[in-house]
């Protein structure tokens, strides 16, 4: 009979951050600028990407959810103190804190999501995206689909460049597809711009009441509020539609 060959299992590795400095360990930390990692939008997309990458290389992954911009440096510092190998900071608002931490810790790799790097640092990679093009595609679709020639968008604050790019791209896409369409784009005030689903829902409802049959929602929990308001409408999927952002929000 053919001999069965089995491989000896490798010694179990403790998956925690008690010894990130050891060569055999790899630790990844993630810090959000606002909101939670299960926000069904921007943060979740980043966190799921980090989970996949950590799983592929056998790394330990831990996250911190920021609730106040004043905490950015301290939250990053939690991972620096334990000598994490890579720290991912999520959101435009963390750009300054990320660059400062990277400059002070040249042996740690930093990844800044939605962060343009004005100064090149060898250990800091800024991930930026063509939000205007994505917004344009969403707007073009809305312009083609609308039956009322009225479409809307409910967004986070326009003081955050990626959000503004989404909005302007959306507006231009609508007009390219349907020059007769009326486009209403509203932005939340800077305070709580991404964590106000009630405002998002109210604005989406207002736009539909005014005749919009397509609403684009982008801006964390605020945009989600708009999408949920449209999704729960009796006309949803037949005469009223919404367009999500960042991840496949049909599923989330």
Briefly describe each language-model feature range.
Residues 1-252:
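A residue-level marker of the well-folded mature domains of exported/periplasmic proteins
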């Amino acid at each position: 009979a053919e001999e069965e060959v089995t491989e000896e299992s490798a010694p179990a590795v403790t998956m925690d951050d008690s010894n990130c400095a050891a060569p055999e360990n790899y630790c990844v930390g993630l810090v959000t600028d606002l909101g939670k990692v299960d926000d069904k939008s921007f943060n979740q997309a980043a966190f799921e990407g980090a989970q996949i990458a950590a799983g592929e290389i056998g790394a330990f992954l831990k996250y911190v959810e920021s609730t106040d911009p004043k905490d950015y440096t301290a939250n990053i510092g939690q991972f620096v103190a334990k000598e994490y190998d890579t720290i991912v900071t999520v959101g435009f608002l963390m750009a300054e804190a990320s660059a400062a931490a990277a400059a002070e810790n040249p042996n740690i790799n930093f990844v800044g999501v939605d962060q343009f790097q004005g100064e090149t640092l060898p250990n800091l990679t800024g991930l930026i995206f063509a939000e205007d093009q994505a917004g344009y595609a969403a707007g073009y679709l809305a312009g083609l689909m609308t039956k009322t020639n009225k479409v809307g968008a409910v967004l986070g604050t326009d003081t955050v460049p990626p959000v503004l790019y989404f909005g302007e791209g959306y507006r231009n896409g609508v007009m390219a597809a349907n020059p007769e369409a009326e486009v209403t784009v509203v932005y939340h005030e800077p305070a709580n711009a991404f964590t106000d689903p009630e405002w998002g829902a109210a604005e989406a409802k207002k736009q539909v009441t005014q005749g919009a049959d397509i609403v684009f929602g982008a801006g964390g929990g605020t945009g989600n509020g708009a999408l949920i308001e449209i999704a729960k409408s009796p006309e949803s999927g037949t005469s009223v539609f919404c367009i999500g952002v960042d991840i496949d929000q049909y599923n989330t």
